[in-house]
């Protein structure tokens, strides 16, 4: 059982959090250089000092990844934002800055409150098409109010939460909203999925992708005509306030729209369904503007998680919702009045600290501990590689006209080494490379350009022993180091060489101005007192590796 802790009491306006909000940004680290690495052993990507572990969510305004700080071991959430807007009809070379990215960053830099998700670091590399926000990780995920097997838009009730559990959620959200509004921030997208629960049970407001703010701290934000059009197109329609759905009156984006969406959220938590629903957007907007608010009967409420409520509690809940879902924004209840409403303060006060939730309701994602590997060799990736697949690499927005020839490429390549026990770095040699478009049978599906690099990677040398490279004609000869093993490793698997020939033809498939298949294999033979290892690729790229000491080596295929 997970205890939901007591909600945080709002700070007085004399607090430093109110008067010195600008100081919050000084706690946030801003990094202007992004380095992307790939771990071929764990098949995970590493963004600067953060190992990407899993996907937490894919929203309209960005993806969110679970990551581990390699320095501290702490878990964080990384939100990935597109720096440029995607506009149909425009050339790929015409890049339009996404104004919501800077807006979200500026809003979050001003926030520092226990009921608001914390921003730790901003990774903003001008060379990258992405902007990364390193955020506080709330391990119990978003607030759930309907069964997992039900779509929220089709939920018909009852709720899986009790009235007491819902009250605890609402009190934390009200505390967070009070802080935001005091800073002149209107969230504009309050809903259960944007309310995250930390490991200690605190509810935190997240996702400021459509939030609006003013530098003066005013809670009434007048929008320009362009902002008006955008604000009506962004957010979650089922949680829109009536003033967002209507085009008849002059629109002002005020904190009252957060009060409305809070009312819709509370309705979902208490009754397990949306207060206004329809089959189309126009019907939904008409329902929000004109349809009177309706409630399930008290008899219906006696089923499920709400079976223990009294008629008085049910009546007070309806009264609060009527004041929250008031169609006239000027008549809507204020946050301060919500906290003292009978529904919020007359029930369950004596045992508030004992309120708990089932693990099935607020489950915690289990994360495996860091890898125990003592030595991991990391491959540097292009800064604009994608996190779309954690076991593949592909480049976005790559201009085919900018492809370089082999002569233009830098012949030296040194992957980064992450060594937990300060072992000697491995010897790495770039045997050869070619640039074209590649696609893997398993996960490479992008039609943009790739660089394929075939490399021989030797095990660590002992003492001062070095690996020597010799060149003969069109072939490269490598003298091996220590540690006997025949293994080929790539992002798509490992291939041990037990026999005299092992086919690698399934590793890469070319797309573009190259032969339609790559045929690569290893041939083992004997010449005098040494073993010759021969690696072939599509009959035109031949590498010979000589092993004079009859030791073994591993070969890696990396797709960059």
From Swiss-Prot:
<dbReference type="InterPro" id="IPR017441">
    <property type="entry name" value="Protein_kinase_ATP_BS"/>
</dbReference>
<keyword id="KW-0418">Kinase</keyword>
<comment type="function">
    <text>One of the three SNF1 protein kinases (with SAK1 and ELM1) which are required for growth on nonfermentable carbon sources and nonpreferred sugars and for response to environmental stress. Activates SNF1 by phosphorylation of its activation-loop 'Thr-210'. Required for the regulation by SNF1 of the transcription of a large set of genes, the modification the activity of metabolic enzymes, and the control of various nutrient-responsive cellular developmental processes. Also phosphorylates GAL83, MIG1 and SIP2.</text>
</comment>
<feature type="active site" description="Proton acceptor">
    <location>
        <position position="189"/>
    </location>
</feature>
<keyword id="KW-0808">Transferase</keyword>
<keyword id="KW-0067">ATP-binding</keyword>
<keyword id="KW-0597">Phosphoprotein</keyword>
<feature type="binding site">
    <location>
        <begin position="56"/>
        <end position="64"/>
    </location>
    <ligand>
        <name>ATP</name>
    </ligand>
</feature>
<dbReference type="InterPro" id="IPR011009">
    <property type="entry name" value="Kinase-like_dom_sf"/>
</dbReference>
<dbReference type="GO" id="GO:0005524">
    <property type="term" value="F:ATP binding"/>
</dbReference>
<dbReference type="GO" id="GO:0106310">
    <property type="term" value="F:protein serine kinase activity"/>
</dbReference>
<feature type="domain" description="Protein kinase">
    <location>
        <begin position="50"/>
        <end position="344"/>
    </location>
</feature>
<feature type="binding site">
    <location>
        <position position="79"/>
    </location>
    <ligand>
        <name>ATP</name>
    </ligand>
</feature>
<protein>
    <recommendedName>
        <fullName>Serine/threonine-protein kinase TOS3</fullName>
        <ecNumber>2.7.11.1</ecNumber>
    </recommendedName>
</protein>
<comment type="similarity">
    <text>Belongs to the protein kinase superfamily. Ser/Thr protein kinase family.</text>
</comment>
<dbReference type="Pfam" id="PF00069">
    <property type="entry name" value="Pkinase"/>
</dbReference>
<dbReference type="InterPro" id="IPR000719">
    <property type="entry name" value="Prot_kinase_dom"/>
</dbReference>
<dbReference type="InterPro" id="IPR008271">
    <property type="entry name" value="Ser/Thr_kinase_AS"/>
</dbReference>
<dbReference type="GO" id="GO:0004674">
    <property type="term" value="F:protein serine/threonine kinase activity"/>
</dbReference>
<keyword id="KW-0346">Stress response</keyword>
<keyword id="KW-0547">Nucleotide-binding</keyword>
<dbReference type="InterPro" id="IPR030616">
    <property type="entry name" value="Aur-like"/>
</dbReference>
<keyword id="KW-0723">Serine/threonine-protein kinase</keyword>
């Amino acid at each position: 059982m997970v205890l939901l802790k007591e909600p945080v009491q709002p700070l007085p306006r004399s607090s430093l959090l109110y008067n010195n909000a600008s100081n919050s940004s000084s706690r946030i680290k801003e990094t202007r250089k992004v380095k992307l690495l790939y771990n071929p052993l764990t098949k995970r990507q590493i963004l600067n000092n953060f190992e990407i572990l899993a996907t937490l969510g894919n929203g309209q305004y960005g993806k969110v990844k679970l990551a581990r700080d390699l320095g501290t071991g702490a878990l964080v959430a990384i939100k990935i934002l597109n720096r440029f807007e995607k506009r149909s009809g425009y050339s790929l070379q015409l890049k339009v800055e996404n104004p919501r990215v800077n807006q979200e960053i500026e809003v979050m830099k001003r926030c520092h409150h226990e009921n608001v998700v914390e921003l730790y670091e901003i990774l903003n590399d001008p060379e990258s098409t992405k902007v990364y926000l390193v955020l506080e990780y709330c391990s119990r995920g978003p607030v759930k109010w309907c069964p997992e097997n039900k779509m929220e838009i089709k939920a018909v009730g009852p709720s899986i939460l009790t009235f007491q559990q819902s009250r605890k959620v609402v009190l934390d959200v009200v505390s967070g909203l009070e802080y935001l509004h005091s800073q002149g921030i209107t969230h504009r997208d309050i809903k259960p999925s944007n309310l995250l629960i930390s490991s200690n049970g605190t509810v935190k407001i997240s996702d400021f992708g459509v939030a609006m703010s003013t530098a003066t701290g005013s809670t009434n934000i007048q929008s320009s005509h362009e902002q008006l059009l955008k604000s009506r197109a962004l957010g979650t329609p089922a949680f829109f306030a009536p003033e967002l759905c209507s085009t008849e009156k002059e629109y002002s984006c005020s904190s009252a729209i957060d009060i409305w969406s809070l009312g819709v959220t509370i309705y979902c938590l208490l009754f397990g369904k949306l207060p206004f629903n329809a089959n189309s957007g126009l019907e939904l907007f008409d329902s929000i503007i004109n349809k009177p608010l309706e409630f399930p009967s008290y008899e219906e409420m006696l089923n499920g998680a709400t079976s223990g409520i009294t008629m008085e509690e049910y009546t007070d809940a309806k009264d609060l919702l009527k004041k929250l879902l008031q169609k006239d924004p000027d008549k809507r209840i204020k946050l301060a009045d919500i906290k003292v409403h009978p529904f919020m303060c007359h029930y369950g006060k004596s045992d508030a600290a004992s309120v708990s939730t089932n693990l099935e309701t607020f489950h915690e994602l289990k994360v495996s501990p860091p890898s125990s590997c003592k030595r991991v060799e990391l491959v540097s990736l292009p800064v604009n590689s994608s996190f779309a697949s954690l076991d593949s690499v592909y480049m976005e927005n790559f201009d085919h006209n900018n492809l370089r020839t082999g002569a233009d490429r830098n012949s030296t390549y040194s992957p980064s080494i992450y060594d937990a026990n300060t072992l000697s770095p491995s010897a790495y040699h770039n045997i050869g490379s070619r640039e074209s478009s590649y696609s893997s049978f398993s996960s490479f599906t992008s039609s943009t350009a790739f660089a394929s690099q075939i490399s021989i990677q030797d095990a660590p040398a002992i003492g001062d022993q070095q690996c020597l490279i010799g060149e003969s004609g069109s072939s490269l000869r490598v003298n091996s180091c220590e540690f006997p093993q025949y293994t080929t490793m790539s992002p798509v698997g490992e291939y041990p060489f037990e026999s005299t020939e092992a086919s690698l033809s399934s590793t890469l498939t070319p797309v573009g101005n190259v032969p339609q298949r790559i045929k690569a294999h290893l041939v083992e033979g004997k010449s005098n007192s040494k073993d010759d290892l021969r690696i072939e690729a599509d009959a035109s790229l031949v590498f010979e590796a000589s092993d004079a000491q009859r030791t073994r080596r591993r070969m890696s295929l990396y797709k960059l």
